[in-house]
């Protein structure tokens, strides 16, 4: 009879097969009441699934990430239950969980409106409040097929016929009269599904194939309690205020238009912001021993076939033909960098060789996936590749970690989550090489003082990788940086060097980026700072404004002096009231406003205000330049206006 081992190492013995719920009840009634499901020997199960042999058990409650996912998945079923009551002819497709929520794809002739969604949400709540039990039944493939055939659920039948072997026993979840098919697990009772919100409706092709019918995708979110739901909705409201597309219009940074989908038209202020970042990264890479290169935008398919991109990535590549030759616009820079490495015989004395490029790449993303400058078709990466020996990998990754931390600090991102993706089931190279590489990455992370989470099986087939996620002002995580070991591309493209024993060997190739896509990183910065960029990044750092025409010449002299110091400055000599000028430039989030009246002209001084409304008093030009220079040097760190 089963002996159940709990996460704290304690064990409980039972004289017959026992469910997760019953194990929880043996510990205490409070835990039993909160039990949603569990993990038995690594397998997720429902609360009432029986355990018939010795097992390790983790019990899921609403406090767990796994428990929250169960709640969200069950809310998708609740949505199915409700929409079937309101629209009996609807055909149900799929309803998975996603980040922060769930969706359900439905085939319904009636186009759902905001009013329909509100009514659907109300019916869902009405059903959940009845606190009915969710009953799971494992049935034969044939029985499941008969159930959905009788109900006219063509999409469920297709899933059965195409995706599920007839030897399987599908799980059917009964929500009173509504039946759905799922691997589960799901909540045992709908009292867990009271805190949800339907968010929006969009179109989605069945199976993501544009040749199939367009379905209606209903998105929702759900949480364990009302407080968490309210906090999340407030976060979304704040995120909407910070939407980089809205802020770009407000601050005149860039625009997008239908004639160039997924491509950005950068305006002067936005391009100034871009240039500050590029110049900063160029200097940083130079300090860390990188050599900047430039590779062609378009290259023959022969190279892409050798690299493997033509076979594995062709659908995402823009292609063209010229003089009976096929070409592709590069989706990434790595094959071009290998060509530079291969140009001439390399010695072990040349390694490590660090090649960097602000490479312009293009990927044929689906139009529905495009999102402002966060997801585009044309983008630039702070891409670099390090060619080194196996013995140099640890030192190179350790140095990269230090460089990455300093860059993120300068941009104001100090909360970094690190993920180490390890060997997948299918991999290239030897097990010994992989073990050495993985341990090398761990050593490099320790050397940088970074904590990390390990993701077994998540590495690419050609090598393990580290991903770096930064957290913004709203607590959202963004994956930007990465470093990837690659043992395969040097082999495919015949990269080699002469080792110290005069034997030709393959270099290890490290793919690395810190910002990732410039466009996406700029979008993150815009939303993170809500347009109030650190002074060193601000497109306009200072505005000098006169009160009357009599101060115009002095304002021009101040502007000239600041410009000569490399400061991005504008003189506002418009015939407007000073209060109007102050408000306008404050709204535009210009860091410093220098107000000049007759007294300032007489004393050769400046009245200094910040965009936050702080009055820094009157000071000479030299004193202000010293103050501003110190502020710029702080970069993304907290600034004290003293």
UniProtKB/Swiss-Prot annotation:
PROSITE patterns: AA_TRNA_LIGASE_II, TGS. Residues 243-534 are annotated as: Catalytic. Zn(2+) binds at residues 334, 385, 511. GO terms for cellular component: cytosol. The keyword rRNA processing does not apply. Belongs to the class-II aminoacyl-tRNA synthetase family. Homodimer. NCBIfam families: thrS (TIGR00418). Catalyzes the attachment of threonine to tRNA(Thr) in a two-step reaction: L-threonine is first activated by ATP to form Thr-AMP and then transferred to the acceptor end of tRNA(Thr). Also edits incorrectly charged L-seryl-tRNA(Thr). This is Threonine--tRNA ligase.
């Amino acid at each position: 009879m089963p002996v159940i081992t709990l996460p704290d190492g304690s064990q409980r013995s039972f004289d017959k097969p026992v469910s997760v719920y019953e194990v929880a009840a043996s510990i205490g009634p409070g835990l039993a009441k909160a039990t949603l499901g569990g993990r038995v020997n690594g397998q997720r199960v429902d609360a009432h699934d029986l355990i018939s042999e010795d097992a390790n058990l983790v019990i899921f409650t609403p406090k767990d990430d796994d428990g929250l996912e169960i709640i969200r998945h069950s809310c998708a079923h609740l949505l199915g239950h409700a929409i079937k009551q309101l629209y009996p002819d609807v055909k149900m497709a799929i309803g998975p969980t996603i980040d922060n929520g769930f969706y359900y794809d439905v085939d319904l002739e009636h186009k759902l409106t905001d009013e329909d969604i509100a009514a659907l949400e109300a019916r869902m709540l009405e059903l959940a409040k009845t606190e009915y039990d969710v009953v799971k039944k494992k049935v034969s493939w044939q029985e499941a097929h008969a159930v959905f055939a009788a109900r006219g659920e063509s999409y469920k039948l297709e899933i059965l016929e195409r995706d599920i072997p007839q030897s399987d026993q599908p799980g059917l979840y009964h929500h009173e009269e509504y039946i759905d098919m799922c691997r589960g697990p799901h909540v045992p009772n709908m009292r867990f599904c009271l805190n949800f919100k339907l968010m929006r409706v969009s179109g989605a092709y069945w199976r993501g194939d544009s040749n199939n019918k367009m379905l209606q995708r209903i998105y929702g979110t759900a949480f364990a309690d009302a407080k968490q739901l309210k906090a999340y909705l407030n976060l979304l409201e704040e995120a909407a205020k910070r939407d980089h597309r809205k802020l770009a219009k407000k601050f005149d940074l860039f625009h997008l238009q239908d004639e160039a989908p997924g491509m950005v038209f950068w305006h002067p202020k936005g391009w100034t912001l871009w240039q500050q970042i590029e110049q900063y990264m160029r200097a940083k890479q130079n300090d860390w021993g990188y050599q900047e290169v430039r590779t062609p935008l378009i290259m023959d398919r022969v190279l892409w076939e050798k690299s493997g991109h033509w076979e594995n990535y062709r659908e995402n590549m823009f292609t063209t033909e010229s003089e009976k030759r096929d070409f592709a616009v590069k989706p990434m820079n790595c094959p071009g960098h290998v060509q530079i490495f291969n140009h001439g015989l390399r010695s072990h004395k040349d390694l490590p060789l660090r090649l960097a490029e602000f490479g312009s790449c293009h990927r044929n993303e689906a139009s529905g996936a495009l999102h402002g400058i966060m997801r585009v078709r044309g983008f630039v990466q702070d891409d670099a590749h390090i060619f080194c020996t196996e013995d140099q990998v640890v030192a190179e990754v350790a140095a990269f970690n230090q460089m990455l931390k300093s860059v993120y600090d300068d941009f104001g991102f100090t909360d970094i989550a690190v993920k180490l993706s390890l060997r997948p089931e299918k991999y290239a190279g030897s097990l010994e090489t992989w073990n050495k590489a993985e341990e090398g990455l761990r050593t490099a992370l320790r050397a940088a003082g970074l904590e990390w989470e390990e993701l077994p099986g998540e590495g690419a087939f050609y090598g393990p990788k580290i991903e770096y996620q930064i957290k913004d002002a709203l607590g959202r995580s963004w994956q930007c940086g990465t470093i990837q070991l690659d043992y395969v591309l040097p082999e495919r493209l015949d990269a080699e060097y002469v080792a110290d024993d005069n034997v030709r060997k393959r270099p290890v190739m490290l793919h690395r980026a810190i910002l990732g896509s410039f466009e996406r990183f700029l979008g993150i910065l815009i939303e993170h700072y809500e347009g109030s960029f650190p002074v060193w990044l601000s497109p306009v750092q200072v505005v000098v404004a006169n009160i009357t025409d009599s101060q115009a010449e002095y304002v021009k002299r101040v502007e000239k002096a600041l410009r000569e110091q490399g400061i991005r400055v504008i003189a506002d000599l418009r015939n407007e009231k000073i209060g109007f000028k102050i408000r306008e430039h404050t709204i535009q989030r210009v860091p410093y406003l220098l107000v000049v009246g007759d007294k300032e002209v007489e004393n050769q001084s400046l009245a200094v205000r910040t965009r936050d409304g702080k009055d820094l008093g009157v000071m000479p030009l030299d004193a202000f330049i010293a103050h501003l220079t110190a502020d710029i040097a702080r970069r993304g760190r907290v600034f004290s206006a003293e």
